[in-house]
């Protein structure tokens, strides 16, 4: 039996790395509750802080909106109404898996108005719907839906582990129209160069502008997971060898303190990541939104001069404190670009 003071953090030394269930009793007698304990190995990660170009391909074709169009008879046509909705993923047409939206639009155009059986994934449920394409004023068969099959952008790599696994962004990639987390079939990281910085001001977030050349030789890694905690995958050995820096211990939530910390970020074309001073203003260990567990404020005059604070594209910049990697930058306050949020690194690692 271990006596516990609820006013102080508790650390338990375990002999093995595994899951445990602990019985909690009041006064050592009255059963109070059971607590699941996950014992993790002391992990070390290399803080990256480098900008990366991101390209992801969706699992199927994402429906971002349903609409009507004018038909040959000048009446409004809505073939997909009540059948498809924003957020649906079209996986197959007549049993044939889709490779991309070009293939899908070609199949619809070639349907000659015959029924198509679409295999749909909606909220994790897979089912079939039957829809009949109709002609627009130019005689082309349409379904009246807006679709997307990929997303691109610029972000920051957070860390690299000993097996060349990386984590980046600190939050998931959501569709700009539906706001839903995008289902990823595959994805890639590319080299990128920061060519411009738009400073943030109150009411208007700033932005890092990067140039991405999607040539094969510029591909530096594969993205396998897009989750609320960030994007994750494997970096090429060549690129991993270029990531400079010492592997640091992972700082768990209970080790993070309010006060001074640093973020590692790259703001210059062909420049190396630099450390910038911040202050941790508040900690939310059990925040409903795990991407907002750490509340930060930029205090480094160099960073304030360059960016005005936190800007888009800095998401994923690792947060360091007391020689440990403790989190990653995720969001900026719209009304105060010097302030923002971060995710605890242990939450990123739980993906």
Segments predicted by a language model, with ranges:
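A short glycine-leucine-enriched loop at secondary-structure breakpoints
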Residues: 75-89, 110, 308-313
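Beta-strand-enriched, solvent-exposed domains that form extended recognition/catalytic surfaces
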Residues: 1-31, 37
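Serine endopeptidase catalytic core focused on the charge-relay Asp
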Residues: 134-308, 312, 321-322, 330, ...
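PDZ domains, with a preference for the canonical peptide-binding region formed by the helix
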Residues: 4-17, 92-125, 336-338, 343-347
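Signal peptide-directed extracytoplasmic domains
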Residues: 43-77, 121, 128-134
């Amino acid at each position: 039996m271990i006596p516990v003071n609820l006013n102080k953090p508790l650390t338990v030394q375990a002999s093995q790395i595994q899951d445990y269930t602990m019985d909690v009793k009041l006064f050592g007698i009255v059963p109070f509750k059971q607590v699941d304990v996950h014992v993790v190995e002391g992990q070390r990660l290399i803080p990256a802080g480098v900008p990366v170009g991101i390209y992801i391909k969706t699992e199927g074709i994402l429906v971002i909106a349903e609409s009507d169009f004018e038909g040959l008879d000048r009446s409004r046509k809505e073939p997909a109404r009540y059948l498809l909705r924003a957020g649906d993923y079209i996986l197959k047409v007549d049993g044939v898996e889709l490779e991309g939206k070009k293939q899908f639009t070609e199949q619809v155009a070639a349907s000659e108005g015959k029924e198509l059986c679409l295999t749909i994934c909606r909220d994790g449920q897979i089912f079939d719907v039957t829809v009949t394409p109709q002609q627009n004023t130019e005689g082309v068969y349409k379904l009246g839906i807006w679709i997307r099959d990929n997303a691109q952008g610029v972000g920051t790599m957070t860390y690299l582990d000993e097996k060349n696994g990386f984590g980046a962004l600190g939050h998931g990639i959501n569709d700009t129209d539906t706001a839903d987390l995008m289902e990823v079939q595959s994805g890639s990281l590319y080299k990128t160069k920061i060519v411009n910085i738009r400073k943030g001001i109150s009411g208007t977030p700033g932005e890092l502008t990067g140039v991405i050349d999607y040539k094969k030789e510029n591909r530096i890694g594969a993205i396998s997971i897009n989750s609320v905690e960030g994007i994750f995958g494997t970096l090429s050995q060549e690129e991993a060898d270029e990531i400079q820096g010492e592997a640091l211990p992972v700082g768990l939530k209970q080790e993070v303190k309010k006060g001074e910390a640093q973020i590692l970020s790259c703001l210059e074309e062909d420049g190396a990541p630099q450390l910038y001073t911040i202050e941790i203003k508040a900690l939310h260990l059990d925040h409903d939104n795990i991407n907002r567990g750490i509340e930060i404020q930029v205090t480094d005059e160099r960073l304030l001069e360059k960016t005005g604070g936190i800007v888009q594209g800095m998401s994923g910049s690792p947060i360091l404190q007391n020689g440990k990697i403790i989190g990653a930058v995720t969001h900026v306050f719209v009304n105060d670009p010097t302030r923002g949020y971060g995710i605890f690194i242990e939450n990123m690692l739980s993906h």
